[in-house]
Amino acid sequence: MKLSEIHMRDPFILPYEGVYYLYGTRSFHDTGFDVYTSTDLVTWSEPHSVFEKSPDFWGTIDFWAPEVHVYKGKFYMFATFINDHTNRGTAILVADSPMGPFRPHSDGAVTPKEWMCLDGTFHLDEDGQPWMVFCHEWVQIQDGTVCAIKLSDDLHHASSEPIELWKASDAPCVRHLGWNDEAFVTDGPFIFRHDGKLMSLWASFDETGYIEVMACSDNGRIDGNWSVDYPALLTGCDSGHGMLFTTFDGKRKFTCHHPNCDPDERPVLYSVDGLTFTKD
């Protein structure tokens, strides 16, 4: 398969032992996750199921944005879920292989239970402290925020109160949603380092549609002061919710979904030079 044949939102690529593993949201209404594999980023396998909803699993809809991170010899999936009786939130699943099967690890969502949250991602700081960085959703607070919370060493639960890193309207390139002039969106944070600086990708909207945006911590730490005073990295192409990874020959790549409309979303790849993205 080619990437253009894969219907997916929120793509995430894990390079591991010579194989690239591609995870993402199947659709808004599906209740499971797949992985696609490749050795060259061009030809991909057929989908292989890594997680399917069981009768006793707490999430019932909105199976969104799976990310898989290697930590202490295990593979941890951060993914978003909701049901009729709880708020949307990011939970953590675990597996012994990037091919799954993944099983529930956290006791429900790790994000605050009283908040509507999504798109949790993993960060391990220089002190070895694990964090989840996530979005407090605009549907609850209008001006969406990106927040962070410390995790227990075993990634089973949160071990601190959340801290707010920035809000969507702080970014000069972000515009409110067209049908709601008080709604500003934060989606898909992804933490990375560039030239020694701790930075984050995230997604929102401007007058052209979905965009990819950037933030930077002033002290190289999650709990620093974050600036979002940057132009959009991607605008005018209705693309976003991206992440960075390094190929096996040492090149940095970016992937996101394009366009941002169902059912046309496909994962796309960009080559990265500094903070300049060029579509492959």
Residue ranges and their predicted role:
Residues 1-280:
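Carbohydrate-active catalytic/glycan-binding domains of CAZyme proteins
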